[in-house]
């Protein structure tokens, strides 16, 4: 099987649920800065220089 000319990106958008307040929010899987909950301010995703550490419950991976 031939390799595609333009590879698909490995990064995704994620629908996550805050553990503290239950707010659902869409975040990027490879963030450059800390992503905080819009309601309570809890950290949802921390950057690591690549794929972020998700500290919330992942509900869905968006295409």
Curated annotation (Swiss-Prot):
One of its GO terms (cellular component) is ribonucleoprotein complex. PROSITE patterns: RIBOSOMAL_S27E (PS01168). It comes from the Archaea. Binds 1 zinc ion per subunit. Its cofactor is Zn(2+). Keywords: Metal-binding, Ribonucleoprotein, Ribosomal protein, Zinc, Zinc-finger. InterPro entries: Ribosomal_eS27 (IPR000592), Ribosomal_eS27_Zn-bd_dom_sf (IPR023407), Ribosomal_zn-bd (IPR011332). A zinc finger (C4-type) spans 18-40. One of its GO terms (molecular function) is structural constituent of ribosome. It holds the Pfam family Ribosomal_S27e. One of its GO terms (biological process) is translation. Zn(2+) binds at residues 18, 21, 37, 40. Part of the 30S ribosomal subunit. Belongs to the eukaryotic ribosomal protein eS27 family. HAMAP family: Ribosomal_eS27. This is Small ribosomal subunit protein eS27. It comes from Pyrococcus furiosus (strain ATCC 43587 / DSM 3638 / JCM 8422 / Vc1). The lineage of its organism: Archaea, Methanobacteriati, Methanobacteriota, Thermococci, Thermococcales.
């Amino acid at each position: 099987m031939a390799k595609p000319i333009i590879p698909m990106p490995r990064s995704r958008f994620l629908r996550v649920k805050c553990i503290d307040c239950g707010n659902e929010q869409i975040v990027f899987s490879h963030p450059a800065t800390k992503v905080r909950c819009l309601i309570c301010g809890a950290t949802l995703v921390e950057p690591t220089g690549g794929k972020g550490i998700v500290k919330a419950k992942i509900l869905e991976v968006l295409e």
